[in-house]
């Protein structure tokens, strides 16, 4: 039995609140159960130096957690003067995931910066960030389209969503919360497009290795979960 009482293939309640920030071109408050992340998408009329005069744009991401988003207060990374390895890994993952479904040539020489700030953490912050970031990115591109800068359908090639899966109490489960994540025998994150393409898989065994059969079971859970998340994204932007 899962601590939350959920079935092995049951995700937490997921919601998207669009236009949460009045300043950003695109924004979304995404909730995966008790994990809440505020995502903003900001348009900048510039590109990284290595892309100048290439005709291509860029999508990048930053990720952070509020000090009291967790059980005990964490120090702000800014106070220590540097980002931790986990933060850098997650924000690169978010950026890679979004770029996988963006035509950078069609975006033109512009940069969209995605900021993911975890307000409350209960497991799955990176997967919630990616899934909510797609909404914020979509709305930023819609803002651009209303100003005749781009056509959304030419820039945004597909949906992208992410979900965690793992083996908890010897059972393959989807969308792990903190209690499950902290004691799971296997923990994996999957990033999958709306058309079923796999963008990234991160999998780690804690203690004993997991089998190919177990991995394929987790992949099956993830594909079903991401399909459900994409359906919720479509519903949110309708």
From Swiss-Prot:
In which residues is phosphate bound?
86, 124-126
> Its Enzyme Commission number?
2.7.7.56
Which CDD domains does the record associate with it?
RNase_PH_bact
Pfam families with a match to the protein in the record: RNase_PH, RNase_PH_C
Q: Which residues form a coiled coil?
A: none
**Which keywords does UniProt give here?**
Nucleotidyltransferase, RNA-binding, rRNA processing, Transferase, tRNA processing, tRNA-binding
Keyword RNA-binding assigned to the entry: answer is yes
Q: Which reaction does it catalyse?
A: tRNA(n+1) + phosphate = tRNA(n) + a ribonucleoside 5'-diphosphate
Q: Name a biological process GO annotation.
A: tRNA processing
Lineage, top-rank taxon, reads: Bacteria
Q: Which GO terms describe its molecular function?
A: 3'-5'-RNA exonuclease activity; tRNA binding; tRNA nucleotidyltransferase activity
Does DNA repair appear among the keywords?
A: no
**Which protein family is named in the record?**
Belongs to the RNase PH family.
Quaternary structure note: Homohexameric ring arranged as a trimer of dimers.
Described purpose of this protein according to its UniProt entry: Phosphorolytic 3'-5' exoribonuclease that plays an important role in tRNA 3'-end maturation. Removes nucleotide residues following the 3'-CCA terminus of tRNAs; can also add nucleotides to the ends of RNA molecules by using nucleoside diphosphates as substrates, but this may not be physiologically important. Probably plays a role in initiation of 16S rRNA degradation (leading to ribosome degradation) during starvation.
Full protein name: Ribonuclease PH
Q: Which organism is it from?
A: Agrobacterium fabrum (strain C58 / ATCC 33970)
Q: Which gene carries the instructions for this protein?
A: rph
């Amino acid at each position: 039995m899962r601590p939350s009482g959920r079935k092995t293939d049951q995700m937490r309640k997921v919601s998207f609140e669009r236009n949460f920030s009045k300043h950003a071109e695109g924004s979304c408050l995404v909730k995966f159960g008790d994990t809440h992340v505020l995502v903003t998408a900001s348009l900048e009329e510039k590109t990284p130096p290595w892309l100048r005069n290439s005709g291509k744009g860029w999508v990048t991401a930053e990720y952070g957690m509020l000090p009291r988003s967790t059980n005990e207060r964490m120090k702000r990374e800014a106070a220590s003067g540097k980002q931790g390895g986990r933060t850098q890994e997650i924000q690169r993952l978010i950026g890679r995931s979004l770029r996988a479904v963006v035509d950078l040539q069609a975006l033109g020489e512009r940069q969209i910066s995605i900021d993911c700030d975890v307000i409350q953490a209960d497991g799955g912050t990176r997967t919630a960030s990616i899934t909510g970031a797609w909404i914020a990115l979509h709305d930023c591109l819609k803002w651009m389209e209303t100003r005749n800068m781009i056509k959304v359908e030419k820039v945004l090639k597909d949906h992208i969503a992410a979900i965690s899966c793992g083996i908890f109490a010897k059972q393959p489960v989807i969308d792990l919360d903190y209690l499950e994540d902290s004691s799971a025998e296997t923990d994996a994150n999957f990033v999958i497009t709306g058309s079923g393409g796999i963008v990234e898989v991160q999998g780690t065994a804690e203690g004993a290795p997991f089998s190919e059969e177990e991995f394929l079971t987790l992949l099956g859970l993830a594909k079903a979960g991401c399909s459900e998340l994409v359906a919720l994204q479509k519903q949110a932007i309708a």
